């Protein structure tokens, strides 16, 4: 490790080693390094010598890089929309953002962090991963990067709490999702005299009617690389809160009830009514496991329709409009609210959100994080569709069509709102849930074994 040569410096080598290790791991700015060194008791000259010994620059180039790296899961039309968000930032600042998309974000981030070549910024699909990375000291606290007064006026406290760890803000919630939406083609429903279901039993009855006509009522796909299974987890979470209510949901998330509890088993079984329904999904179960969630969303809107209903969050609208550019909202595509299972919890929804985190500390990162947090930046994607802003100052009128506006209104008016269960559980439990659901889709008779396996993981993870 780097050593100081000034005999007057009375700083422990352990403290210096920790600072150097943190610098090499996190890549914070020269200024931050100097400030932290001097806080340890080093003189300015000794701090500068130490910085040079670790490969730090003596000029401000590293503080103001003209190119930033950003890692995300967004590909296809989602990445196109994000590039549209970033374009004005590059025009205004001259800072280019190199975007890398991967379905295996967890694995790639782990490798990059170990190799000390982490991206400048990452966009994580859930706050659970943010909590894990913050605990590992792999993230930069945002309190000194953003105007906290502005952030507090733009974001509800609940979102800021979710983005915090040990009292510091580590994440800006950027793209939210209302996960209480079931997608369908109104024209097909009208021509076939199908009524949108209000209750779960109504939906099962409709599904059986469609299947009885030799058609497939549902499309479903859970393939997503190393995250395969998450769309099924969204199903289960949405069912659970509608079936057992918010208090039991919180106990489930906190592992105050075991995965073998009847409430959890019931939620899996209700999901199984769709996934394993007779003549419900073409080619099931193999097709469910092999089909990507984006491709599965197209079914109700193909001609002729390959299916009649598809469940996933309101970001599905972006998939539909990108694939079928001539379709008109409300006339050709729409959603109905997730059907009521228990009248006591009518209207309950789950939500998700993608979060912006900083993995290096420099002025360019600071500028991009500040920009992405603004209503103006988020409104760009809002107007393109398939995006729900977390910044509360984006007006509903900015949403491009009545379907998107209805989803936002549904989200703000929902009597019960819970964050997607897997997304706020420990990451190893989330992974166990995903893989367990894949096994359940393939082998429904193995449900008890699946739940016992997830419980074994949870028993260790929550200690």
Predicted features and spans:
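Conserved C-terminal helix/tail region of periplasmic/extracytoplasmic solute-binding proteins
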Residues: 8, 12, 18-21, 190, ...
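Glycine-centered hinge/linker elements that transmit conformational signals in sensory
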Residues: 207-208, 253-288
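N-terminal secretory signal peptides
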Residues: 1-32, 41-49
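Extracytoplasmic/periplasmic substrate-recognition and gating elements
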Residues: 87-88, 92, 315, 322-388
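A structural signal for short loop-to-beta-strand junctions that line the ligand-binding cleft
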Residues: 111-112, 119-120, 151-187, 217, ...
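Hinge/lid segment of periplasmic solute-binding proteins
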Residues: 127-180, 204, 210, 231, ...
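Extracytoplasmic "Venus flytrap"/periplasmic binding protein-like
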Residues: 85-155, 162-164, 187-198, 299-301, ...
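Periplasmic solute-binding protein
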Residues: 133-137, 159-196, 222-252, 350-356, ...
């Amino acid at each position: 490790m780097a050593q100081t040569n000034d005999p007057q410096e009375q700083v422990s080598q352990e403290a210096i080693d920790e600072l150097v290790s943190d610098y090499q791991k996190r890549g914070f700015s020269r200024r931050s390094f100097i400030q932290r060194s001097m806080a340890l008791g080093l003189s300015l000259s000794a701090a500068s010598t130490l910085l040079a010994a670790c490969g730090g620059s003596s000029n401000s180039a590293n503080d103001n890089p003209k190119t930033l790296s950003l890692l995300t899961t967004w590909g296809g039309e989602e990445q196109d929309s994000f590039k549209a968000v970033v374009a004005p930032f590059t025009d205004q600042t001259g800072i280019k953002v190199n975007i890398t998309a991967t379905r295996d974000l967890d694995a790639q981030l782990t490798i990059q962090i170990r190799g000390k070549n982490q991206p400048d910024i990452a966009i994580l699909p859930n706050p659970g991963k943010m909590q894990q990375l913050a605990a590992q000291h792999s993230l930069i606290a945002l309190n000194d990067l953003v105007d906290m007064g502005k952030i507090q006026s733009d974001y509800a406290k609940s979102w800021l709490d979710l983005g915090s760890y040990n009292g510091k803000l580590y994440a800006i919630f950027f793209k939210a999702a209302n996960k209480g939406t079931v997608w369908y083609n109104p024209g097909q429903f009208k021509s076939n005299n199908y009524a949108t279901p209000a209750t779960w039993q109504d939906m099962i009855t409709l599904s059986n009617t469609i299947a009885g006509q030799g058609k497939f009522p549902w499309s479903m796909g859970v393939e997503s690389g190393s995250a395969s299974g998450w769309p099924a987890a969204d199903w289960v979470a949405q069912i659970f809160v509608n079936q057992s209510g918010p208090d039991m949901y919180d106990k489930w998330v906190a592992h105050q009830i075991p995965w073998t509890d009847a409430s959890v088993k019931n939620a899996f079984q209700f999901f199984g009514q769709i996934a394993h329904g007779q003549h419900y999904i073409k080619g099931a179960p193999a097709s469910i496991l092999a089909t990507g969630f984006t491709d599965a969303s197209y079914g109700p809107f193909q001609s002729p329709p390959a299916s009649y209903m598809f469940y996933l969050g309101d970001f599905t609208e972006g998939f539909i409009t990108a694939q079928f550019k001539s379709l008109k909202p409300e006339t050709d595509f729409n959603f109905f609210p997730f059907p009521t299972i228990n009248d006591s919890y009518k209207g309950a929804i789950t939500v998700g959100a993608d979060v912006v985190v900083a993995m290096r500390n420099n002025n360019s990162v600071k500028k991009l994080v500040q920009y992405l947090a603004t209503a103006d930046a988020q409104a760009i994607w809002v107007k393109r569709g398939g995006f729900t802003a977390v910044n509360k100052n984006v007006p509903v009128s900015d949403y491009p069509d009545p379907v998107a506006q209805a989803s936002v209104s549904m989200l703000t008016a929902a009597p019960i709102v819970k964050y997607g269960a897997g997304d706020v559980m420990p990451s190893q439990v989330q992974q166990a849930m995903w893989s367990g659901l894949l096994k359940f889709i393939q082998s429904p008779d193995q449900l008890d074994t699946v739940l016992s396996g997830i419980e074994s993981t949870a028993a260790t993870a929550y200690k």
